[in-house]
């Protein structure tokens, strides 16, 4: 049995489809849905609520996935088998396939994580091998419970984005590996945790990225762990942080204007 945690928000058809695919897996899956319609704690806190539910139970692995992630029927079994045969792997990720073209991979491993995430992508035939990667996309990742007990849960200073890459960097800094598992696949519709391009949602994303920069980009560790870390000069980091803070101020003003107009 492998528990699966789904942060849910405002799309019943996506959730029903996601659950249907989990129920059709070749290994048993226990499903925990954190209903953010009821009270929206956003992605990171929702995931942590599920992790804490299962952390003291005798499961080897915990699966995290978005409501718009639809796993092939052998995906969970393949991920668990890979983790069994790679004891140093703390986090595993399947190939995420384009919802309109399942022969195209939209996530095969993280590249840059800051200021916005960029992923390895391309035709499916280019990603036939398992590979150690820098970070996994939080739309679907399997976590080793032993690792969670060592490094803790996700950092809730992130609200909507960034906690997945942050968690992978934290794991790798403690000696754990992150892998893409090529034999495990799923369709990803994209955008379930933060699809609306509203000022308040965009503001949350900006704040998450500012926090990521403040946490990781002030020392040499991130350069060692990140994609093309040597190119992250202090001047570049300073410029990007200034741009993010400017964008934050503009979005805060937009949000204030919306509130004022609604009074």
Summary of predicted features, one role per range:
Residues 38-54:
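Glycine-rich, basic loop-to-helix element that forms the pyrophosphate-binding segment
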Residues 20-33:
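Short, acidic, metal-binding catalytic loop of nucleotide-sugar glycosyltransferases
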Residues 92, 97, 165-259:
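Active-site-adjacent helix/loop segment of glycosyltransferases
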């Amino acid at each position: 049995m492998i528990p699966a945690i789904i942060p849910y928000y405002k799309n019943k058809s996506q959730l029903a489809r996601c659950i249907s695919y989990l129920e059709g897996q070749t290994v048993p899956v226990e499903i925990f849905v954190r209903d953010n319609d009821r009270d929206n704690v956003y992605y990171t806190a929702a995931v942590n609520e599920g992790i804490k539910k299962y952390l003291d139970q005798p499961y080897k692995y915990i699966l995290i996935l978005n409501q718009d992630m639809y796993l092939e029927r052998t995906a969970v079994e393949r991920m668990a088998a890979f983790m069994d045969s790679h004891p140093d792997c703390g986090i595993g990720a399947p190939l995420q396939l384009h919802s309109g073209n399942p022969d195209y991979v939209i996530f095969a491993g993280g590249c840059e994580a800051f200021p916005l995430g960029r992923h390895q992508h391309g035709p499916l035939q280019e990603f036939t091998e398992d590979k150690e990667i820098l970070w996994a996309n939080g739309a679907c990742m399997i976590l080793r419970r032993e690792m969670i007990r060592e490094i803790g849960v996700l950092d809730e200073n992130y609200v909507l984005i960034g906690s997945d890459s942050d968690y992978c960097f934290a794991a790798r800094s403690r000696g754990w590996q992150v892998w893409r598992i090529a034999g495990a696949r799923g369709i990803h519709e994209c955008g379930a945790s933060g699809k609306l391009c509203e000022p308040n949602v965009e503001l949350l994303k900006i704040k998450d990225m500012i926090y990521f920069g403040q946490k990781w980009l002030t020392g040499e560790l991130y350069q060692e762990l990140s994609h093309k870390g040597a190119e992250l000069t202090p001047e570049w980091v300073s410029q990007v942080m200034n741009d993010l803070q400017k964008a934050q101020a503009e979005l805060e003003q937009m949000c204030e204007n919306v509130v004022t107009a609604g009074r």
